[in-house]
Amino acid sequence: MLSSCVRPVPTTVRFVDSLICNSSRSFMDLKALLSSLNDFASLSFAESWDNVGLLVEPSPPHTVNTLFLTNDLTEEVMEEVLQKKADLILSYHPPIFRPMKRITWNTWKERLVIRALENRVGIYSPHTAYDAAPQGVNNWLAKGLGACTSRPIHPSKAPNYPTEGNHRVEFNVNYTQDLDKVMSAVKGIDGVSVTSFSARTGNEEQTRINLNCTQKALMQVVDFLSRNKQLYQKTEILSLEKPLLLHTGMGRLCTLDESVSLATMIDRIKRHLKLSHIRLALGVGRTLESQVKVVALCAGSGSSVLQGVEADLYLTGEMSHHDTLDAASQGINVILCEHSNTERGFLSDLRDMLDSHLENKINIILSETDRDPLQVV
């Protein structure tokens, strides 16, 4: 009897171990998940006016088993979040944008925050960081046009300077004894990186010194150089720029491999966005048979991004009445699909990309209730 009781134990242990292993693959620490999300698309790509990143954080430690994707976080969507027991909401649009002076039950956005915290649900928003990203919303929107090459309309700047500091100081030193003194002084300033090389000015051998400086270090460098009139008069100070990124930025200017009629392009866009109707403003002198070769697009609200861009067609979610008139007067066709209709379909692609990026460590689900508030009736 004792022997028969002992035998099942290893099987039970293996079963429990299996559950533990599976469980460990189904959770991520919130901080680790946020780091991975930033690796996927850096929040540094977001516009300066935007409110992105972690907006609501439950008290730590907080682990995430289910990540819930939605374009807009409404109260109806929050009900779905709670029913599906999600731990973190990725809301493309930030539900908190303007500063809140109080958290009460009076407004719907305040209620979202209360319900999230009461139920230990975090809220994260990438918004314009995903607009700019190479694998982001605008690239997804461009997929509906057909074969084309595209580039950002307004390229993003790299998040960091290629070298230490944001200023470069350049000057020549004539004599060996001066060189040793100068090199010793500038190398002793924090936030300065130094390079030097031989240079000839006329018939005179000199040493060219380049200093890459932080803003704080620049003031100390200038203070040192200004004590030597001869050095200071030969000094050049350059303000460095962060380089532009080739595939990252706002909007996309797309050149089709082959021109198509406007009517054909309309059909393609409807299929891609799964819409039965769109709004069209024909450019002056254009018809449905006019050819389209270049498309400028911007998911969401495209007025500021598309303004002044030369193209056969503007594609966006919404544009002001007067901006539409301006574009049409220049012979540019305008297609408007409602704001979130040009964004929401990206979430299906995002789910697949995040599954791969996060190595299937957590469950990722799409909202079934999220939808554009405007309907054609």
From Swiss-Prot:
Record field: transmembrane: none
Any single Pfam family the record assigns to this protein: DUF34_NIF3
GO CC term (a single one): nucleus
Keyword presence, rRNA processing: no
Location(s), subcellular: Cytoplasm; Nucleus
Keyword Iron: no
GO BP, sorted A to Z: negative regulation of transcription by RNA polymerase II; neuron differentiation; positive regulation of DNA-templated transcription
One MF term in the entry's GO annotations: identical protein binding
Residues with N6-acetyllysine modification: 109
Keywords, ordered alphabetically: Acetylation, Cytoplasm, Nucleus, Phosphoprotein
Superkingdom classification of source: Eukaryota
Main location group: cytoplasm
UniProt modified residues of type Phosphoserine: 259
Residue positions, PTM Phosphothreonine: 255
Start and end residues of each stretch annotated as Mediates interaction with COPS2: 244-377
NCBIfam families listed in its UniProt record: YbgI_SA1388
Function: May function as a transcriptional corepressor through its interaction with COPS2, negatively regulating the expression of genes involved in neuronal differentiation.
Subunit structure: Homodimer. Interacts with COPS2. Interacts with THOC7.
Homology family: Belongs to the GTP cyclohydrolase I type 2/NIF3 family.
The name this protein goes by in its record: NIF3-like protein 1
Organism from which the protein derives: Homo sapiens
Gene name tied to this protein: NIF3L1
